[in-house]
Amino acid sequence: MKNDELAKLEGLVGDWDLTLSDAWFMEPGWVGHGHATVEWIGEAFLHLHGEFERDERSTWDWVIGRSDANERLTVLYHDDRGVCRVFGMTLDGDEWTMLRQDPDFHQRFVGKMSADRIEARTDASEDAGKTWRKDFDITFVRR
């Protein structure tokens, strides 16, 4: 039986085309394309597997779960560089946010969702959230 709060994430399930743009770490005008699949692991977690083609394939995985005791969603992140991170997550109506506040730097993801599209932006802060710089825009379009 799915947790009622996790069931609210059902709209993320499916196959998505991805577009990454306006990334500070790429040449101006560069646009990347990829895809993501979101599916349930049992009835307890969501798994997002994403891939982008750049000079070589770039992959990452998110596992989304929930703590009933503190009423929070959590995202575990891992990518093909071996990077592992933990984000807090909220889904409030059509706004999807993820936030990481770690000693090395902070990151945030803010997206607006509709049934077939998610427009999101990621930012980073190297001064504990006092100032933020844009990382990139990412768009999900349901296949």
What residue spans do the PLM features occupy?
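N-terminal helix-cap/turn-to-beta initiation motif at the start of protein domains
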Residues: 1-15
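Beta-rich strand-turn-strand
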Residues: 112-116
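Conserved Ser/Thr-centered positions that define the repeating blades of beta-propeller domains
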Residues: 123-126
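Short, hydrophobic/aromatic-rich segments at coil-to-beta transitions
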Residues: 13-17, 42-49, 70-75, 91-99, ...
